[in-house]
Amino acid sequence: MLVTTASAADAPTVTSVKEHQSAKKVIVTVATKYFKIDAKDVGKANKAGKGHEHFAMDKGKYDYPKYSGANGKLAVKLGVQGKYSPSVTNKVTYTGLPKGKHTVTVYLVHNDHSNYANASAHKTITFTVK
C-alpha cells in the first residue's frame, strides 16, 4: 500500500546518516525531516509521514542478533534477518564488525515495512572499521 504526502516538498527525507566508532561498536545514527517514528503502530495501518527505519549493513550480511543486538533479534522475529535490522529509534549499534570497508543503507518505511517511494527516503554511507 502506497501512502503519499501532501507534496514532494514535504516527503519523508533522510537528511544524514553518520557512524561513530567506539571500542568494538559502530553506532549508526540517522537524521530525518518530514518523518516521525511511530513505534506503537508498526505492523498496523500506514500513516503519511510516519513509520520506522530499516538499516541494511553490507546488504544485510550483518543484520543478525550477533551484530545488531536487539534490532537483530527483532529482525529474526519478523523473519527478515540477513536482509535488514528494523528500528523504532534513529540509531542502531553494531558490534563485532570485522575490520575493513562497510556500507550501510537506511530506509524510511511505512508501518507495514514497505519503503517510502521517494528517492530522498533512503541514504547510503560507506565507512571503514579500523
Language-model regions: role of each:
Residues 15-16, 41-43:
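Short secondary-structure capping/turn segments at boundaries of alpha-helices and beta-strands
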Residues 8-26, 31-35:
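Short, compositionally biased P/S/T/A/G/V-rich stretches that sit at domain boundaries
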Residues 25-37, 43-130:
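Long, low-complexity serine/threonine/glycine- and acidic-rich segments characteristic of extracellular
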Residues 3-6:
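N-terminal signal peptide c-region/cleavage motif recognized by signal peptidases
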